[in-house]
Design a protein with these regions (language model features):
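A nucleotide-sugar donor-handling region in carbohydrate enzymes
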Residues: 40-112
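Short acidic-hydrophobic, aromatic-tinged amphipathic segments that line or gate anion-handling sites
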Residues: 49, 68-69, 155-159, 211-217
Length: 251
């Protein structure tokens, strides 16, 4: 919301307006971010795009001037942090070991209401892998006020800062998220990523088969197993299905 507020003020006061990460589209107008980015793109003087796909989407909206593909500043920052920061105390503080847990971040309204949280948590009960969930206070209040059962393997921790988040991303086995920012970070770090959304702005990680949109129909446990394409004993996921089904899956 601060993005569109600042953009409107700049436009009204005739201040030169540059939109970084322009052209991102989910085409889901129920997302507040989608409305903000659409409006900001159409009133900006200079549009700096993180992906070529964003440039193409702006062309479809007849925004062709002062549009530049400059690359992803978020990934430049992540690379810098990976090169300069390696304090893994967040792992010991939460009794975690490298490559032995999944990282989950969900915060969007359609995933954090009582009904959906119960459904997601019910599915997580079938996963025989620790799932670390840095939880937003609003989501925590929903869980507590509705007495939602927390699966044994789900470890709720307090929200973490950016540096510690990169450590969790770098040391986890795979990621479950509905975050926009985590998706390209997972791709950059070669961490398989299950996106708890029906659409996404980040197309490249999908095309490269690093990330996948959850279909909200298949059992989450089975969906993860099929996506990772590894033997059942390697990912420690118990889906209560015949072991023969997984014998031919490639590591």
């Amino acid at each position: 919301d601060s993005t569109i507020a600042g953009a409107i003020v700049a436009r009204k006061l005739k201040i030169y307006l540059i939109h970084i990460e322009a052209g991102m589209r989910s085409y889901n107008k129920d997302m507040p971010e989608e409305i903000n980015r659409l409006m900001t793109d159409h009133i900006s003087d200079l549009l700096l795009c993180s992906t070529q796909d964003s440039v193409d989407k702006l062309k479809q909206e007849n925004i062709k001037e002062n549009v530049h593909y400059v690359g992803n500043l978020q990934l430049e920052l992540l690379k810098y942090v990976c090169d300069t920061y390696n304090d893994k105390s967040i792992l010991s503080e939460n009794n975690l070991t490298e490559n032995n847990f999944a990282l989950m971040t969900i915060h969007r309204e359609y995933n954090t209401n009582e009904k959906m949280l119960k459904k997601i948590f019910l599915e997580l009960q079938k996963i025989d892998t620790d799932v670390v969930f840095p939880i937003h206070p609003r989501t925590k209040n929903i869980i507590e006020s509705n007495n939602i059962n927390i699966p044994k393997k789900l470890k709720l921790i307090k929200p973490v800062d950016y540096l510690n988040m990169t450590i969790l991303e770098r040391t986890c086995k795979f990621i479950i998220t509905d975050s926009g920012g985590v998706q390209p970070e997972a791709w950059f770090l070669s961490k398989k990523c299950i996106i708890m959304r029906s659409e996404t702005e980040w197309i490249e990680p999908l095309k490269n088969n690093n990330n996948i949109l959850y279909d909200y129909k298949t059992s989450l446990c089975k969906f993860i197993q099929n996506f990772l394409k590894v033997q059942i004993d390697e990912v420690n996921i118990n889906c209560n299905v015949s072991e023969n089904i997984f014998n031919k899956l490639l590591v």
